A protein has these predicted regions:
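Short glycine-centered, acidic/aromatic-flanked micro-motifs in structured strand/loop junctions
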Residues: 121-123
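Short glycine-rich, flexible loops that bind phosphorylated cofactors or substrates
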Residues: 126
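Proline-centered loop/turn at the N-terminus of a beta-strand
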Residues: 145-147, 171
Length: 188
């Protein structure tokens, strides 16, 4: 929006004021605009996530969410609400982002509102065993005290399930719905 726009006596057109919205995915091509951004709109956790390159939105619930892909993450949040729970966040990792499992888990563990965590992986192109390996390494390093419930389906899920059993002594629940119900129950 440009308002006002004036024409000077010598014929030049000058925008005296303007407002614009830049898409988050395009701002990386404009570092000067990114530096002048509005970090005051981000929560502390959101600012930390952004600095770490994570896709995170802080919410007011008590069930932590870690999933692969925006669609699955939003579905997980919807099912949490369906079962009477409240998601504490939106946080997705996947594909090459599995290397961010540790900063993602550190971020979730620093959220004092989270009473339980659901980790929901569904692989088509992304391999669930690779994503699960990253999460297992983060869990082994950070040793979280809160209950964690897994749902793992798709490409590499047999290997992922074996990794969870062998390394953490846990098995994912049979369905996404079962894992989410358990997480909602544990958070109550």
């Amino acid at each position: 929006e440009i308002n006002p726009l004036i024409v000077t006596r010598d014929g030049r057109v000058v925008a005296l004021d303007c407002k614009f919205v830049m898409d988050d995915s395009g701002i990386v091509r404009h570092p000067d605009v990114a530096r002048a951004g509005t970090p005051e709109k981000l929560t502390g956790l959101e600012a930390r996530a952004k600095a770490a390159g994570l896709k995170y939105i802080d919410l007011e619930g008590n069930v932590g969410v870690l999933a692969n892909g925006a669609g699955l993450t939003m579905t997980t949040m919807d099912v949490i609400r369906h079962h009477g729970g409240r998601p504490a966040n939106f946080l997705e990792i996947g594909g090459e982002s599995y290397t961010q499992a540790r900063p993602a888990l550190e971020l979730l563990l620093s959220n004092s509102r989270i009473n339980s965590l659901v980790i929901n992986f569904c692989g088509a192109f992304a391999r669930t065993d690779v994503m699960t390996q990253g999460v297992i390494e983060a869990i082994e390093a950070l040793k979280p005290k809160l209950p964690i419930f897994f749902s793992v389906h798709g490409t590499g899920d047999e290997e992922a399930i074996k990794l969870l059993k062998d390394r953490l002594g846990v098995a994912p629940l049979a369905t996404m719905d079962d894992a989410i119900k358990a997480a909602v129950g544990a958070a109550a």
